[in-house]
Amino acid sequence: GCSFYETQTQEALDAGHRPVWFLTLGQSGTTDVRMEDCTVRAEYCETIFRMVGDKTRAVVDNCDITMKQPDSMAEHDMKKGANPMLARGNDRADGSTVIQNSRITLSGDNGRRICYQLSALKGNTLDVSLGCGIASTKEVSGNTIRGRIRHKVFQDCSGVENNKVDVRRFSILG
């Protein structure tokens, strides 16, 4: 496996420059990629994985993924966008964008959510502290989700089964 670490210069941060996507796994044309046994660490990007495109097939398997949004980052408004921290998928139910068997730690503000429009999120362990949970994902199964979530854990998801959820509702002070 490989290791991916987000790095930012102080000059870029002072100028307000932050990447939107950390790793793009498919965008245009035909993409078939599998990421296994990797370590991913990020802080300043908006979303770790971009997995969009009609012909994208992207699987993240058995990875250690951490994103902890610094307190100095501007708050997100969940009414003005999906604001996923982990991934934005292609909204297909064919298993083409999947994160599975991974250990995931996410920490963000009240306007952040775990993921949006993935085909599947399955068999993962998620430790979270953020505003929203999993949204518009086709299959959510066999996950252990613990920590703190302000709003719904599952929103507009189908195929939600066999998940162990131990979360507290809270409000992140701004």
Residue ranges and their predicted role:
Residues 6, 10-30, 43-55, 62-64, ...:
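Extracellular beta-strand/beta-solenoid scaffold signature
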